[in-house]
């Protein structure tokens, strides 16, 4: 049946039995397709009936359907004509793992960062009103913990003050990656446990109003009493007191019930909250039995067992996790903070070992940062573990609440640089540019697991300001030994005998191994290369000035945007020191990159061993910088 669904209109003629069959078919499709490519499986298994109902009630794209935390949009993609492309999910030139404006007119926003859909909805509804579009509803599907983010409540405050037709669907599965925490989560849990008193009261209203003479008076008295009891006992008052209509809670796996609730909400023609209770991983035993994450995201797996088909090597996240636990065992002042991602950021083991020193603040990076500032003021040393891309959300708090007060807070930035399959919104290519302008900030970029352990230990010893440790996604690889350490800077390679100090390569973090390989290629071209790892890359160590002055060309290699990264900082440091050495950088262009593997993206932008070696050869030739004016081949193949 799924093959016959080319668009939402094809759902309108289906019977209830056919809808149930289609839901089962969609789940089976999701399990087998996502098992083959990797992706967000659990969240999408939980929204099958909800998404079917949305597309039967609303006229997409005339009525925009916005998915907060857009990893919930796989079923939406299937129902809008893209099921045939799921073999390419998250692959280069294939389907995005998130809504994508370039894919379909049904995708309004490139949504993947949480808590933003309601603000989009507020703006769209205002625009439709100003443009005279009277019969357009805006639907925002908010779930997977997004309502723990403060931006949602800022938007709700504005939406509630209007009469614009915004339908807010709360997909309540009690989770983000892990179980959702906080007061709001407890409110939703209370709503789930309520009996269907609204239905009973409605029957009572009809009966009382039917009594001759005194019926209306009795009804009004009953209504007043009911309102008082409801305000005292019902958690949904957090919505209704804002002026929002509330419908629910609804069984999110009963398509007919969800559809009825959505039609009811649509008829309000005003802001309304529809509370839908779903189960993440619904219908797939391996996901339902995954207590920690309900298979929120997975790599390539066996669809029958849910087990990974290959075992990855030791990863950066695991190395961080182990090291933090070792440090915390020695230091009672070390505490850990996550923004709803204990598993992905490596803090699950810390939570089990030190539950009283672990804080999951929900999807609230801004609060995480200022809460960390408070902890530091109180004598603790907070370690805030975030994906690099989510640091962007907490910049003001980092700058004004942490750095201005010179507080010892350590930020650990996982998924720095190019992450790949999750696309533009998840690349961590801005962190060095952001961190580099923060006064007093010290940034480490470990090249391997040994340096990660070393630099994290150094970071938590800093008492007079914030620190950050950044590393990429994936396997950590082999340790890369240093030839020597000069004033804190590790020297990884030096010119071969008989070659001059032609080029200084400053390798940032995980690009160290590639930089050493580049040096070997250039040696064969007669170019003498020194490769160094600054370890603490920002601010630029003083030893870099000394090393640069002894070479004819300085090249930085980094997986940050070229503007404002380590390359920019090195150039500025040399100018201030009046060291007149040409500087070049091999860095990411200032662009948003489509989803593809990390290797594919780096190859596309020229950050490979061969391309960098060829670039340096050309720069050296142009500068005439080789010893004795030797002729340098343009080819390093």
Curated annotation (Swiss-Prot):
Q: What is this protein called?
A: 1-deoxy-D-xylulose-5-phosphate synthase
Instruction: Write down the SMART domains for this protein, in alphabetical order.
Output: Transket_pyr
Q: Which gene encodes it?
A: dxs
GO molecular function terms listed in the Swiss-Prot or TrEMBL record: 1-deoxy-D-xylulose-5-phosphate synthase activity; magnesium ion binding; thiamine pyrophosphate binding
Q: Which GO terms describe its biological process?
A: 1-deoxy-D-xylulose 5-phosphate biosynthetic process; isopentenyl diphosphate biosynthetic process, methylerythritol 4-phosphate pathway; terpenoid biosynthetic process; thiamine biosynthetic process
Magnesium keyword on record: yes
The UniProt subunit note reads as follows: Homodimer.
Q: How is the cofactor bound?
A: Binds 1 Mg(2+) ion per subunit.
* Record organism: Mycolicibacterium gilvum (strain PYR-GCK) (Mycobacterium gilvum (strain PYR-GCK))
> Which residues make up the binding site for Mg(2+)?
144, 173
Alphabetized UniProt keyword annotations: Isoprene biosynthesis, Magnesium, Metal-binding, Thiamine biosynthesis, Thiamine pyrophosphate, Transferase
């Amino acid at each position: 049946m799924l093959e016959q669904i080319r668009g939402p209109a094809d759902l309108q003629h289906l019977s209830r039995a056919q809808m149930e069959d289609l839901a089962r078919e969609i789940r089976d499709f999701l399990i087998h397709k996502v098992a083959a490519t990797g992706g967000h499986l659990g969240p999408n298994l939980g929204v099958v009936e909800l998404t079917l109902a949305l597309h039967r009630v609303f006229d997409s794209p005339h009525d925009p359907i916005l998915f907060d935390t857009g990893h919930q949009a796989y079923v939406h993609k299937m129902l809008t004509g893209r099921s045939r492309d799921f073999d390419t999910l998250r692959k280069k030139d294939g389907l995005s793992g998130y809504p994508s404006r370039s894919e379909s007119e049904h995708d309004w926003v490139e949504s993947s960062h949480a808590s933003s859909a309601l603000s989009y909805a507020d703006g769209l509804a205002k625009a439709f009103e100003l443009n005279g579009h009277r019969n357009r509803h805006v639907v925002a599907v908010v779930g997977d913990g997004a309502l723990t983010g403060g931006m949602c409540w800022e938007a709700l405050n504005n939406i509630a003050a209007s009469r614009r037709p915004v339908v807010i669907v709360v997909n309540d599965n009690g989770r983000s990656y892990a179980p959702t925490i906080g007061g709001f989560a407890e409110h939703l849990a209370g709503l789930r446990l309520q009996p269907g008193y609204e239905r009973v009261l409605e029957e009572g209203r009809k009966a009382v109003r039917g009594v001759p003479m005194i019926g209306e008076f009795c009804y009004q008295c009953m209504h007043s009493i009911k309102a008082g009891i409801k305000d005292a006992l019902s958690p949904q008052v957090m919505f209704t007191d804002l002026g929002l209509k509330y419908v629910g809670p609804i069984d999110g796996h009963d398509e007919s019930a969800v559809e009825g609730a959505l039609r009811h909400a649509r008829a309000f023609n005003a802001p309304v909250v529809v509370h839908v209770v779903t189960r993440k991983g619904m219908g797939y035993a391996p996901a339902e039995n995954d207590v920690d994450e309900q298979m929120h995201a997975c790599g390539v797996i066996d669809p029958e067992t849910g087990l990974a088909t290959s075992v990855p090597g030791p990863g950066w996240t695991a190395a961080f996790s182990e090291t933090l636990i070792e440090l915390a065992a020695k230091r009672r002042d070390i505490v850990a903070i996550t923004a709803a991602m204990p598993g992905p950021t490596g803090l699950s083991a810390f939570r089990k070992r030190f539950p009283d020193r672990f804080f999951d603040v929900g999807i609230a990076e801004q609060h995480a940062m200022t809460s960390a500032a408070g902890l530091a003021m109180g004598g603790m040393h907070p370690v805030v573990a975030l994906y690099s891309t989510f640091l962007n959300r907490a910049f003001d708090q980092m700058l004004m609440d942490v750095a201005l007060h010179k507080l010892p807070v350590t930020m650990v930035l996982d998924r720095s640089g190019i992450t790949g399959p999750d696309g533009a919104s998840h690349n961590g290519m801005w962190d060095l540019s952001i961190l580099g302008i923060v006064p007093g900030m010290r940034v480490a970029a470990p090249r391997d697991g040994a340096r990660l352990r070393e630099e994290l230990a150094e970071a938590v010893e800093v008492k007079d300001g914030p620190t950050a440790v950044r590393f990429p996604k994936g396997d950590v690889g082999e340790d890369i030994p240093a030839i020597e350490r000069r004033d804190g800077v590790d020297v990884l390679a030096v010119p071969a005998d008989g070659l001059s100090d032609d080029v200084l390569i400053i390798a940032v973090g995980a690009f160290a191994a590639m930089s050493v390989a580049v040096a070997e290629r250039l040696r064969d071209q007669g170019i003498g290369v020194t490769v160094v790892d600054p370890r603490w890359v920002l601010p630029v160590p003083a030893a870099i000035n000394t090393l640069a002055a002894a070479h004819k060309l300085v090249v930085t290699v980094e997986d940050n945007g070229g503007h404002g990264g380590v390359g920019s900082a090195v150039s500025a440091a040399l100018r201030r020191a009046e060291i007149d050495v040409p500087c070049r950088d091999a860095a990411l262009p200032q662009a948003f990159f489509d989803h593809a593997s990390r290797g594919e993206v780096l190859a596309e932008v020229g950050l490979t061993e061969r391309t960098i070696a060829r670039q340096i050869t050309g720069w050296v030739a142009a500068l005439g910088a080789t010893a004795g004016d030797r002729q340098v081949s343009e080819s390093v193949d």
